[in-house]
């Protein structure tokens, strides 16, 4: 689950701020916290959280969303330090525009959203859930056993063109 929206910081309602941070940060915190005892017992514990390219960039009218994704990155980096001694790695994915439930309303509203992000992408398209799944599969694999505290950008080259 994830939420975007909230509007400009100046006019954002506190309830909108709280709701976005609750879904995007507090839920991630609670899930990570609940998993820690199990991960410590695992021979190869892995945490992979979902951030956003907004962890590096920012967008007007996206103050709560951008803040929430910075918090996910900070939490994940902290978990990498706290759990490393147990062999647990903690990383996060930084997706660009991916065709998901979050982007569905924008895609359904007309061609502008897809055209905007496709033009920004070096690959000329939006990402698919399988693109994120592949990145997650890599981070949970033994090939990534020495990667921790890292944000893996999966954005089709958007940040390279920015």
Regions inferred by a protein language model and the residue ranges of each:
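Residue(s) in the substrate-gating loop at a strand-loop-helix junction
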Residues: 52
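Short C-terminal tail/terminal secondary-structure segment
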Residues: 57, 137, 148-162
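A conserved structural motif in NAD(P)-dependent oxidoreductases
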Residues: 121-132
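Substrate-binding pocket helix/loop in short-chain dehydrogenase/reductase
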Residues: 8-9, 16-18, 113, 117
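Active-site helix of classical SDR
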Residues: 32, 68, 76
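Short, small/polar-rich loop/turn modules that mediate ligand/substrate recognition or access, typified
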Residues: 84, 89, 147-149
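Active-site loop-to-helix junction immediately N-terminal to the catalytic Tyr of the SDR YXXXK motif
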Residues: 12, 58-66, 78
């Amino acid at each position: 689950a994830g939420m975007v929206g909230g509007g400009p910081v100046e006019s954002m309602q506190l309830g909108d701020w709280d709701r976005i941070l609750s879904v995007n940060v507090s839920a991630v915190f609670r899930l990570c916290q609940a998993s820690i005892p199990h991960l410590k017992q695992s021979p190869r514990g892995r945490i992979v959280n979902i951030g956003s390219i907004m962890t590096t960039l920012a967008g007007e009218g996206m103050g709560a969303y951008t803040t929430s994704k910075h918090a996910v990155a900070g939490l994940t980096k902290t978990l990498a330090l706290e759990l490393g001694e147990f062999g647990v790695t903690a990383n996060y994915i930084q997706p660009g525009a991916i065709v998901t439930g979050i982007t569905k309303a924008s895609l359904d509203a007309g061609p502008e959203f897809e055209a905007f992000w496709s033009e920004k992408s070096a690959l000329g398209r939006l990402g698919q859930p399988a693109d994120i799944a592949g990145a997650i599969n890599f981070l949970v694999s033994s090939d990534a056993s020495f990667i921790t505290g890292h944000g893996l950008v999966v954005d089709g080259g958007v940040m390279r063109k920015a």
